Amino acid sequence: PIVQPYNIFSNTFACMAFAQLAKATGSEEYAEIAKKTFERILARRSNPKGQWNKLYPGTRPMKDFALPMIICNMALEVEDIINDPALIDKTIDESVHEIVDVFYQPELGVIMENLAPDGSLIDCFEGRRVNPGHDLEAMWFLMNIGIRRNDRKLIDKAVEISLSVIKYGWDEKYGGIFYFMDRKGYPTQELEWDQKLWWVHLESTIAMIKGYQLTGNEECLEWFKKL
């Protein structure tokens, strides 16, 4: 089917791929594609879907967690190609702030998938959505940033959030991590909410073993073995 290029996440993965390909081959052409794609992604951050947004205009304005999460990882993957330390640091700083200080809810111990533009909670299906696998994936991204910056405080925070999220998302009756959850415990919009998907557990095992390697936290190792 012919589909308009509405999804900015295709661009982020392409950017990382071309950056790694440029490093592997030394190709300036691939490096230039990575640089231009990186610039376009940053320019589209405030309105990533542009004219192809499916939401009804003027209703439930939201910002999503997925974008700052993937941008912080992308910045790490392309920094050697971009060769602009100030831009990379600024991009990472902004993304880490959004993840840790805005989307993470300490009183709940989880990261929200969607918030109001001002960072407040929204009481609707999308606004109550929790995706434990997404949260845990983001935490090992933050651990990698902590390694790059020699920032033990950030690593410890990522481990703390990881352990909180995996406890929240774990199915105590049957085992495994739920796909989607509702922060108020209501039924979710997604019919597949209780499926135990492979990628969720893959991201979780990475977060747990990386957390153990970096901090020696035995609880991370116990969860890794359990997974």
What are these regions (language model features)?
Residues 1-227:
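Glycan-recognition and catalytic cores of secretory/periplasmic carbohydrate-active enzymes
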